Amino acid sequence: MRGGIHLRMYATFFVPRRWRSKFVRQLDNEMETLLKNSRNAVFRLLLREASVILVGMLMVGVALLLGQQEFIFPELAALSIGCLVIVKRVWCVDRWRTVVLLTGAALLGTLLFYSSLPFIAKIALGFSSVALLLILLRSSLYPALSACLLPLVLNESSWVYPLAVFLLALLLVGMQWLMEKLRLRTALPFRPVARTVHERIIRAVYLLIVVTIVVSVAAFFEQRFFILPPLIVLFVEFSRPEAGLRKAPFLITVLMAVAALLGNFGKLFLEPFLGLSPVLSMGSVLLLLFVVFSTSKRYFAPAAAIAVLPQILQQDNWYLFPIEVTLATALFIAIALLFFRAKRTAGQN
């Protein structure tokens, strides 16, 4: 609106009198159109955010109705932000790849859960297998890593889990398709990852080494909050030298800390003290998280997964959850910034 005032002043002093009224009239029409488009954009954004909140509430509601905790899939909240709320390309993926990657990763995680391999070997095999699947499908849907590692880190799973992830993935892509049909978001064609297979394999090996070391230390000290799957996804995202997230490490750390606090707030305060059902508690937590995102002007998908996690975590050490999430976030970001930098070309100093 300030721009409109300045243009009106320009019209008053510099536009000839005979053209002035016509100029001002056109200016008012254009400003009204811009304001209307802006309001429409805000309305569409609010609808997309509301859809994520409804997905989270539906997920918890179905889990309670069926008595199957496996239907609470924290990464679905993160995926919903990337696939429904954010209009630009977040991951190199399309709908069928989304379903295949998430379902395949969940099935692999369940198989590893029932295997007799040591914990660290399960994590390493799960991480490397999903990384290979991402390479084969030329995709960058890194939240698939979380689908595989979640039952291993939490040490809880059943054969219902891959079925639940499959159904939730169908729900996600179905809502994305519907939003595109309703013009609430623009359809984006699939664009494969630009890196060569060799480059991606080398990078996956380096990532695997770091993840294995951190997992080994966390397992030794029995502090599994340090290696929650959304944190590993965060590390993989941050390890990309071209990622815009690398420009705001402090903000991302704060968002993860706030998300962890909100998750605990919902589970430990809204439900027992205010008497809210888990469904309403989940909706309230996601609503508050979107307020934080809007205030910070940054949507960060893994933070949504962190906010959902307390719904399925054992609450014996609830006070450690936000502390360890914050420390692990800072650690993973520091490692990514220090050891995963862009290669310098010959013309650079």
Residue ranges and their predicted role:
Residues 2-3:
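Extreme N-terminal basic, low-complexity initiation segments
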Residues 6-103, 107, 111, 115, ...:
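Alpha-helical transmembrane segments and their membrane-interface boundaries
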